[in-house]
Amino acid sequence: MLVKPMACYFEIWTRKVTTIEDFSLAIANRFKQMGSHSDSEVDWDNEEEVWEDEVHEFCCLFCDSTFTCLKDLWSHCKEAHNFDFYQVKQQNNLDFYACIKLVNYIRSQVKEGKTPDLDKLSDILRSDEYMISVLPDDSVLFSLGDELDSDFEDDNTLEIEVENPADVSKDAEIKKLKLQNQLLISQLEEIRKDKMNELTSQTTDQLSVTPKKADNDSYYFESYAGNDIHFLMLNDSVRTEGYRDFVYHNKHIFAGKTVLDVGCGTGILSMFCAKAGAKKVYAVDNSDIIQMAISNAFENGLADQITFIRGKIEDISLPVGKVDIIISEWMGYALTFESMIDSVLVARDRFLAPSGIMAPSETRLVLTATTNTELLEEPIDFWSDVYGFKMNGMKDASYKGVSVQVVPQTYVNAKPVVFARFNMHTCKVQDVSFTSPFSLIIDNEGPLCAFTLWFDTYFTTKRTQPIPEAIDEACGFTTGPQGTPTHWKQCVLLLRNRPFLQKGTRVEGTISFSKNKKNNRDLDISVHWNVNGKADSQSYVLN
């Protein structure tokens, strides 16, 4: 009997049918063919007749790695994710169907950003919920039968005489086909549901005339799903070592404590806390990167200490009432860009114990005046001559946007001043939108070309611990021109009008931060200033 793999049925059908009725008819016809050709070769609609050395792609249960051999996949899971399929199967005495459920259970948990609980397998595998394939055409499921048959042959030490070996082969094949049939029926039901949802959505869209609200959150979380952004952040030694040193130098406040990591990303801060002795770390993220964070925890033997939860901090619940410490790297350009501080403050109000600690404990926005003739003017002067053409109209956008770049310390022409402080234990979401006064004294004569701002970050081990005015490595880190450059760089507000100022001239004014009305993750900045009795102002958008 020539048996064509079930995964191929599904592939062929999806090329030929376009409606749910077509799917149902295709299933009926295909299994009718199978039943009427029990001992002969089947005509597969002129598809390939011979299925020799077919190459399968086996996807890892925990990460994006793929393999062409199932045994290689299990070896990878054991080495990279501390999951021994053969040991789990043997210890729990799992049969063919239970192994199917095990694979689907693990895939479903990883997809939801959760850590699979293998200690409760007996209860979990009683449900038929995990007979439904998580991945379409999951080669692991379709090859488990061969895997288990192979195990049986390896373990069988008795020679048994079989009158008709073909009958045993057919029985095994029938068993496998029944399972594959059940899987396909489950997949068909999912397709049916998806199709109905699609039709319902289309109908709703046709009836509705109300413009859809921009989904800025989805775009935001998707932007943190890839490796590049995390490479940039982790490679920032000032940032990463600042957090690491705070945790490792203060292991006494983490030992035996419960920690919440808001926006865990790759899980680096959670792993720092676990290594420092935290009893439990709850790592929350709403981006696909959480799947890699789970893999990272498994790989480093920290999966028992860290529980990953996928979702918005505003929506999720924790297995515990309160936590002892909340840690988060939430800072954006100009500190509040992307508005992640809002989520951290929500987490504090929902989950932090009254005596709990926020890490970092305080952040400060800092402003200075900048003088230069080259670096800061480059994005403006570029448009004066573009391959022989004038494009001066393009200059306007450069004055409306915030230029994020590394500013040399030599361009700083006034003693920096703090214009906003955020005590993370007490501040409120509404405090993030503000207007603050500032006063700068010019150090050397020259044109006032721009205002430049950055932020400083402070860590404390107690809620009431005094915070020094000066920033140093012992208490935190700076993102200013005087320090080692970071991926945050500095934010430059270029001025249209550039008055020439003498040494000692005072520049006074106000600076305002507010959320952009079109996208609340973008940042609007307005500056009003007065020099020698002459007032001026300018507004910017950081997006």
UniProtKB/Swiss-Prot annotation:
Binding residues for S-adenosyl-L-homocysteine, per the UniProt record?
239, 263, 285, 287, 313-314
Tell me which CDD domains the record gives: AdoMet_MTases (cd02440)
What Pfam families does its record include? ANM3_C2H2_Zf, PrmA, PRMT_C
A GO cellular-component term linked to this record: nucleus
Any one Gene Ontology MF annotation carried by this entry is: protein-arginine omega-N monomethyltransferase activity
Q: Which GO terms describe its biological process?
A: chromatin remodeling; methylation; regulation of DNA-templated transcription; ribosome biogenesis
The protein's superkingdom reads Eukaryota
Identify this protein by name: Ribosomal protein arginine N-methyltransferase rmt3
